C-alpha cells in the first residue's frame, strides 16, 4: 500500500481515515453544527473554497497526491464511501438537530446525518475531488469535454449548495 501508482486501496484508506477522524471528532467535540455557514456566510465561504481549490490546482498540480485526487480510483472510493454512509444513516432513525442523542448513535452521529462529522468530512472530500477533476479538465480543455464539464459542474454546484443550513427538515407522521 502507498506504492505508486495509488489505487482503490489508498482511496478507501483515505476515506476510512476521514471516517475515523470524523468519529473521533464527534465523540470528543460533539456533532458538527454548520449553522455558521447560513446565508450570507455560505456565499463567502463558497467563494473562498473555490479560490482555495483553484490555488491548490494551479500551484500543486504536478504533485502526485493532487494528480491522484483527480483519478477515477479516488472518485469511486469516495462515492462508495458516501453511499455506504448514506445507506447506514438511511436505515437508522433520524432525529431533529435540537434533540440530544446519547449512546452509540450519538457517538457515531448516524441518527443525525446532517450533523455527523464523519459524513461532513467525507462529503467535503468528495466535493474537493470533484472540484479538482473539473479544474483538470478545464486546464486541458477540448470541445469533446463540454458534456463532461457541464455534468460535473452541475453536480458540483448542487453538492456545494446542499448543506445542512439549506435543507429543510420535514417530519411525517403516519
Give the role of each language-model region.
Residues 1-174:
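Solvent-exposed, non-transmembrane regions of integral membrane proteins
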Amino acid at each position: 500500500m502507498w506504492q505508486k501508482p495509488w489505487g482503490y486501496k489508498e482511496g478507501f484508506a483515505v476515506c476510512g481515515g476521514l471516517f475515523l477522524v470524523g468519529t473521533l471528532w464527534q465523540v470528543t467535540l460533539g456533532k458538527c453544527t454548520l449553522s455558521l455557514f447560513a446565508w450570507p456566510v455560505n456565499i463567502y465561504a463558497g467563494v473562498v473554497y473555490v479560490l482555495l481549490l483553484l490555488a491548490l490546482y494551479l500551484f500543486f498540480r504536478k504533485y502526485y497526491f493532487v494528480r491522484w485526487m483527480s483519478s477515477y480510483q479516488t472518485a469511486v472510493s469516495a462515492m462508495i464511501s458516501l453511499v455506504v454512509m448514506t445507506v447506514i444513516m438511511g436505515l437508522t432513525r433520524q432525529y431533529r438537530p435540537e434533540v440530544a442523542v446519547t449512546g452509540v448513535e450519538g457517538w457515531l452521529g448516524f441518527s443525525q446525518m446532517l450533523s455527523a462529522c464523519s459524513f461532513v468530512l467525507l462529503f467535503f472530500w468528495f466535493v474537493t475531488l470533484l472540484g479538482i477533476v473539473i479544474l483538470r479538465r478545464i486546464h486541458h480543455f477540448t470541445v469533446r469535454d463540454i458534456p463532461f464539464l457541464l455534468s460535473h459542474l452541475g453536480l458540483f454546484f448542487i453538492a456545494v449548495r446542499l448543506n445542512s443550513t439549506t435543507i429543510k427538515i420535514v417530519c411525517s407522521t403516519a
